[in-house]
Amino acid sequence: MTVKKLYFIPAGRCMLDHSSVNSALTPGKLLNLPVWCYLLETEEGPILVDTGMPESAVNNEGLFNGTFVEGQILPKMTEEDRIVNILKRVGYEPDDLLYIISSHLHFDHAGGNGAFTNTPIIVQRTEYEAALHREEYMKECILPHLNYKIIEGDYEVVPGVQLLYTPGHSPGHQSLFIETEQSGSVLLTIDASYTKENFEDEVPFAGFDPELALSSIKRLKEVVKKEKPIIFFGHDIEQEKSCRVFPEYI
């Protein structure tokens, strides 16, 4: 079985210090990075990967003022970038979705999770537990009343949608390997690799455990060597220029 359609859906932008993309750089320059959600149309039903930024980020570039990342992260989010409004544009309500896949629970990937009170949210156990107590996680991203489906390690969501455990950027990050009807195999690294340079040249970037992150990149390289998928990175400005976005699909 394969995924009928894989949509790339823009979900706002985020100004991030360039030292977060390349740890060797001196902090002080901000990059304007894309924030993505991904919609998978499968035989079993629609699956959403990540939910963008929280409502508290709408028109609020100073969201992180007074925190340890003040001046290093500036969300650029409008009302249109709220996940419920994104879903309306693609023809769905929150309860229409089969699953939410949370690649990890950082603010720009799980900020909209609270809109899904019934839909199962698939997350790694190590990520869920880290988000309960580590300071880099916002409370909007680890709400207690949601329908979490806690997994451990690699996991097949439905035929053609495989989660790959890629910790390092965060304690329980997961990437996706997808078999699509139109384009063949696709690897979504998400934040296991922000950019092509992080992946191909193993340029270190921001994260929980740099050595573990490098191990995950090496693991994904083995997947690429064997399966030869199309690769999409988590926040690559250059790759963004050639991405086909909704309503186009791959």
UniProtKB/Swiss-Prot annotation:
It catalyses: an N-acyl-L-homoserine lactone + H2O = an N-acyl-L-homoserine + H(+). Changing A206W: Small decrease in KM value for hydrolysis of GBL, C5-HSL and C10-HSL. Pfam families: Lactamase_B. SUPFAM superfamilies: Metallo-hydrolase/oxidoreductase. The keyword Flavoprotein does not apply. Changing G207D: Small decrease in KM value for hydrolysis of GBL and C10-HSL. Increase in KM value for hydrolysis of C5-HSL. Zn(2+) 2 binds at D108, H109, D191, H235. Keywords: Hydrolase, Metal-binding, Zinc. Changing H104A: Abolishes activity. The keyword Metal-binding applies. Its cofactor is Zn(2+). Its EC number is 3.1.1.81. Binds 2 Zn(2+) ions per subunit. GO terms for molecular function: acyl-L-homoserine-lactone lactonohydrolase activity; metal ion binding. InterPro entries: AHLLactAiiA, MBL_superfamily_lactonases, Metallo-B-lactamas, RibonucZ/Hydroxyglut_hydro. Zn(2+) 1 binds at H104, H106, H169, D191. Catalyzes hydrolysis of N-hexanoyl-(S)-homoserine lactone, but not the R-enantiomer. Hydrolyzes short- and long-chain N-acyl homoserine lactones with or without 3-oxo substitution at C3, has maximum activity on C10-AHL. Monomer. Belongs to the metallo-beta-lactamase superfamily. This is N-acyl homoserine lactonase AiiA. It comes from Bacillus thuringiensis subsp. kurstaki. The lineage of its organism: Bacteria, Bacillati, Bacillota, Bacilli, Bacillales.
